[in-house]
Amino acid sequence: MGEIVVLSSDDGMETIKNRVKSSEVVQWEKYLPKTVLRVLLVESDYSTRQIITALLRKCCYKVVAVSDGLAAWEVLKEKSHNIDLILTELDLPSISGFALLALVMEHEACKNIPVIMMSSQDSIKMVLKCMLRGAADYLIKPMRKNELKNLWQHVWRRLTLRDDPTAHAQSLPASQHNLEDTDETCEDSRYHSDQGSGAQAINYNGHNKLMENGKSVDERDEFKETFDVTMDLIGGIDKRPDSIYKDKSRDECVGPELGLSLKRSCSVSFENQDESKHQKLSLSDASAFSRFEESKSAEKAVVALEESTSGEPKTPTESHEKLRKVTSDQGSATTSSNQENIGSSSVSFRNQVLQSTVTNQKQDSPIPVESNREKAASKEVEAGSQSTNEGIAGQSSSTEKPKEEESAKQRWSRSQREAALMKFRLKRKDRCFDKKVRYQSRKKLAEQRPRVKGQFVRTVNSDASTKS
């Protein structure tokens, strides 16, 4: 804005006006040359044709309106150089919009004119069909003024592409590229599905296929390596306890107290016994499968005892039927039975070792001499047999104890329930379902008052009645 200076003279007023005019914004659009686009409108309906022509002229377009596709084609043949844009309807009487579009695209003089289709059908199939045939745009009726105002952009784009042919190859419509890709992928997928099963992933580019094949091979190798590592680790875990326990059992067998003569007998005769011992006894009570291991060890121990007493091996069905009762009774007292089994097995193992030493010494010495060692061995054998008998008796007593405890618990719960039922019945008898009254005097007064059909009635004095 210019400076405002108040002066008395006329020269001062003129200077103020000149400054204000110079400060105004200059609109350069007035000086630029205006280019008017010429549009060929093809519409069969009269009213819509008149409305669209009015809107286009309001947006500074020159309009040539035609009601028929054949008339539009004749206009294009005569004045193709005077038309910049074609706006046509799909449903036309003589030649349809698709046929007109095909004629325009095939003609050399008209193929550079952008064709815009318009219709009331908003289906995607129709849009794709028109865009594939070469339409520049697809407008859905009713159309807006803004859509008609922006039609010049299509003409501008065609002119820029015509001037620069290298840009034409780079800036093809994205919709056309996508449609071509979708058609190719559909054809390829059909071809591959006919040839093989759809379980395998199919890639259409060779580079992508090679990359994915390489990835699949790498993934297989990695999976194989991890599988081998896990298998080695599992094998090491399985082998480790057996070797440890076997070494320990051999060290225990070959002791300094038995002498050098027993090394051979221990190493040969007791390896099988060590393996059976490890199978029968559970290695740890804290394992997740200790319950099942205890039941298996109990079954094997009972079968061995029955066979030793009877002397005849029994069938597996008979032994299984007899063992069901024992295993069901042993559920509550597992720890005591495990300790007794371990003690009895250790005693029997020692007795076997001592017996083998005695027999070896008898075979080596020609003269039968009873030494202190033999007497001690016989005493330990007797003690071992007594301990095994005590262990069996302890097992039977331990199986009987939980039964007694369960029966006592059931009796106590039953008696408690009966007492609660008796208490409830007595309480129900003592209940009074009458209305509780807070003040007894009011209750008496209410009972004394006369009632008629359940409602109170006022009493009238006899004196008042006589006077009246």
Curated annotation (Swiss-Prot):
> How is the protein altered post-translationally, as described in the entry?
Phosphorylated. Phosphorylation varies throughout the diurnal cycle.
Localization of this protein: Nucleus
Question: Where primarily located?
Answer: nucleus
This protein's UniProt keywords: Biological rhythms, Nucleus, Phosphoprotein, Transcription, Transcription regulation, Two-component regulatory system
Spell out the residue ranges making up region: Disordered.
168-203, 302-416, 442-468
Q: Show the GO MF annotations.
A: DNA binding
Residue ranges constituting the Response regulatory domain according to the UniProt record: 38-156
Q: Where is the composition biased (Polar residues)?
A: 168-177, 194-203, 328-364, 458-468
Q: Does the keyword section mention Zinc-finger?
A: no
Please list the residue ranges annotated as the CCT domain: 417-459
GO cellular component entries = nucleus
Q: According to the record, what induces this protein's expression?
A: Up-regulated by heat-shock.
Record's superkingdom? Eukaryota
InterPro entries (UniProt xref): ARR-like, CCT_domain, CheY-like_superfamily, Sig_transdc_resp-reg_receiver
Decide whether keyword Phosphoprotein is in the record: yes
List, as start-end ranges, the regions of compositional bias called Basic and acidic residues.
315-327, 371-382, 400-409
Q: Which GO terms describe its biological process?
A: circadian rhythm; cytokinin-activated signaling pathway; negative regulation of DNA-templated transcription; phosphorelay signal transduction system; red or far-red light signaling pathway; regulation of DNA-templated transcription
Pfam families for the chain: CCT (PF06203), Response_reg (PF00072)
**Other notes on this protein?**
Regulated at the level of mRNA maturation and alternative splicing by SKIP and PRMT5. The expression of APRR9, APRR7, and APRR5 requires the presence of LWD1 and/or LWD2, indicating the existence of a positive feedback loop within the circadian clock.
What family does the entry list? Belongs to the ARR-like family.
Q: What does this protein do?
A: Transcriptional repressor of CCA1 and LHY, and positive regulator of LWD1 and LWD2 expression. Controls photoperiodic flowering response and temperature compensation. Involved in the positive and negative feedback loops of the circadian clock. Expression of several members of the ARR-like family is controlled by circadian rhythm. Regulated at the transcriptional level by a corepressor complex consisting of ELF4, ELF3, and LUX. APRR9, APRR7, and APRR5 coordinately act on the upstream region of the target genes to repress their expression from noon until midnight.
Please identify the protein, giving its name as recorded: Two-component response regulator-like APRR9
